[in-house]
């Protein structure tokens, strides 16, 4: 998921339909695609927009959470099973729980080369 996630951060949604890269489903709101291969999907509705000097911050209210039972331990989400990753800056690296799993603005470039 790292390479395709990075690719989605590299290309503009105005020029590329990113939803075609994934098998998607729609949740309770029926308004935004959720990704089947993601172990965890959090469906949100917009609640606030904050204009920042160089970006816009969108804040959402959680409507529903989608998580398969295989990612639970004693009825609770198990982060080691889910294996979420995040982007840190300014080093531009993706990290999983306790380990780096990719490099931002590099792995997506490699993935882009595989798109016809």
Report each predicted region and the residues it spans:
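Basic, polyanion-binding surface patches
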Residues: 1-116
């Amino acid at each position: 998921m790292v390479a395709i996630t990075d690719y989605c951060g590299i290309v503009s949604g105005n020029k590329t339909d990113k939803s075609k890269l994934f098998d998607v489903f729609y949740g309770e709101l029926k308004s935004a695609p959720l990704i089947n291969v993601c172990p965890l999907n959090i469906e949100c509705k917009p609640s606030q927009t904050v204009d920042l000097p160089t970006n816009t911050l969108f804040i959402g209210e959680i409507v529903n959470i989608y998580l398969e039972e295989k990612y639970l331990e004693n009825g609770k989400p198990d982060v080691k099973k889910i294996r979420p990753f995040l982007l840190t800056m300014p080093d531009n690296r993706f990290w999983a729980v306790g380990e780096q799993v990719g490099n931002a603005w590099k792995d997506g470039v490699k993935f882009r080369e595989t798109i016809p």
